[in-house]
């Protein structure tokens, strides 16, 4: 089959692509690099106007004319690759807003992909309307919004997550669900909000390419090294404050036996070789 994967979070689509290629399928991966992680793409989409003077221009144009030039730039880049993005048997989106655009532009990009290809599927992976709504209504004992509810993080720090509750994102959600063949959860956080939904296909855990990691016996003759990788942007939502408190206790209790290595915001290729 010819398969098109749109977007990337936490190397999920890269790992899936490697497995699909081994099974004999043709696969194209298009997307952003997932921020500082810089995952490889077949067709790389650059998110422009996000820093310096260009960001100021973007903010000015949006405030005055409600035009998001960053989203329009992403849409133009997608359409430039039209030849490579058409005629696939299956398209899978990593998220309802796989390329981090405004909802209006995300809808147009979604329509472009679904009209130019055959079957369209969606992953519930990362923040989306249903999972954020479920968390906001406190239907989970713990969720990505628990730090917000407990006052550890502000509304401003959670504005990206909370934006999935606004009318524009809700409209995008309903439009996408109307036109997809099905939706797949990648984790329990996304499985629970989707239970009993007519288009829910079930939970498929994140795939891992085990051939990239050699299994070696654990040797603990010297110090036990504990590696902690932090995404600063999601510090509280990922529970890093709890990890750091626990590691401090262990390190203090066993100073001769424990060594803790903590890194922040490393590109994936550097991160994976750091421990």
Predicted regions and their residues:
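N-terminal subdomain of nucleotide-sugar transferases
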Residues: 1-43, 115
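Short N-terminal targeting/anchoring amphipathic segment
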Residues: 2-6, 81-105, 119-123
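A conserved catalytic-core segment of Leloir-type glycosyltransferases
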Residues: 32-72
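Acceptor-binding helix/loop patch of EC 2.4 sugar-transfer enzymes
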Residues: 42, 122-166
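Membrane-proximal helix-turn-helix segments that form the acceptor-binding/catalytic region
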Residues: 75-81, 108-115, 145-182
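A short, active-site helix/loop in glycosyltransferases that binds the activated sugar's phosphate group
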Residues: 131, 160-202, 245, 249
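Conserved donor-binding/catalytic core segment of Leloir-type glycosyltransferases
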Residues: 202-208, 212-238, 244-247
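A conserved nucleotide-sugar
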Residues: 224, 241-272
């Amino acid at each position: 089959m010819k398969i098109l994967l749109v977007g990337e979070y936490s190397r999920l689509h890269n790992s899936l692509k490697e497995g699909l290629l081994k099974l004999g399928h043709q696969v194209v991966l298009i997307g952003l690099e997932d921020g500082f992680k810089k995952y490889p793409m077949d067709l790389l989409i650059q998110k422009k106007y996000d820093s310096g003077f260009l960001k100021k221009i973007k903010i000015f144009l949006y405030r005055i004319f409600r035009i998001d030039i960053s989203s329009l730039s992403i849409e133009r880049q997608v359409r430039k690759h039209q030849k490579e993005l058409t005629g696939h048997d299956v398209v899978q989106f990593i998220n309802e807003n796989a390329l981090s655009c405004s909802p209006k532009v995300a809808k147009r990009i979604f329509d472009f992909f679904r009209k130019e290809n055959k079957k369209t599927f969606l992953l519930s992976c990362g923040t989306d309307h249903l999972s954020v709504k479920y968390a906001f209504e406190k239907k989970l004992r713990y969720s990505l919004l628990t730090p917000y509810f407990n006052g550890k993080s502000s509304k401003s720090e959670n504005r990206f997550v909370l934006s999935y509750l606004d009318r524009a994102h809700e409209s995008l959600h309903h439009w996408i669900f109307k036109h997809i063949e099905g939706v797949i959860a990648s984790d329990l956080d996304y499985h629970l909000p989707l239970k009993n939904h007519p288009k829910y296909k079930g939970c498929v855990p994140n795939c891992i390419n085990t051939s990239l990691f050699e299994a070696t016996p654990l040797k603990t003759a010297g110090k036990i090294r504990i590696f902690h990788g932090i995404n600063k942007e999601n510090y509280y939502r990922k529970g890093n404050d709890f990890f750091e408190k626990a590691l401090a206790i262990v390190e203090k209790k066993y100073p001769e036996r424990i060594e803790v290595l903590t890194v922040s915001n490393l590109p994936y290729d550097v991160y994976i070789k750091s421990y």
